[in-house]
Amino acid sequence: MTTFNTKKLPSARDAIAPDGSDVRLLLTLAGGGLAHFELPAGETSIAVAHRTVEEIWYFLDGQGEMWRKLGDHEETVPVEPGVSLTIPLGTHFQFRSTGKKPLQAIGVTMPPWPGEGEAFEVKGNWPPTVRRSS
């Protein structure tokens, strides 16, 4: 039986994502998980793709751009508070923070994040500037 869960956004990051952004873990159910992502102002993530998960992101703060490529379809879109977007399975993606504040988003991962090896590096649209996770 599923129980109710409630969690406040942690003040410190839980991990560095494979794309180099800071991750604060929120809640998970059988069908998906929720996390908060933050990329410092002026930084560019590492381009990655996922092996088994799809994501939906909603941007909370900052300004930036998200590049996505799936097969022959490729686009770069501006992101800011109020913008949501999808990252279908197998999509190559990369994002950068172009404003004076960190770029912040919450993302739903479906199914829940399985762990190490889920994301793999791909050729991106911009040179990354963030540190790689260890």
Kindly label every feature range from the protein language model.
Residues 29, 40-42, 52, 59, ...:
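A short, compositionally biased micro-patch
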Residues 36, 46, 66-68, 105, ...:
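Short hydrophobic/aromatic-rich beta-strand segments that constitute the beta-sheet cores
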Residues 38-40, 51-66, 70, 108:
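Short, conserved beta-strand element in jelly-roll/cupin
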Residues 71-89:
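Short acidic-glycine-tyrosine-enriched beta hairpin
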Residues 34, 44, 73-76:
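Short, mixed charged/polar active-site loops
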Residues 44-46, 65, 83-85, 89-95:
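Histidine-centered metal-chelating micro-motifs
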Residues 80-81, 89-116:
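Ligand-binding loop in jelly-roll beta-barrel domains
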Residues 1-36, 46-47, 117-134:
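A short, N-terminal "cap"/entry segment at the start of jelly-roll beta-barrel domains
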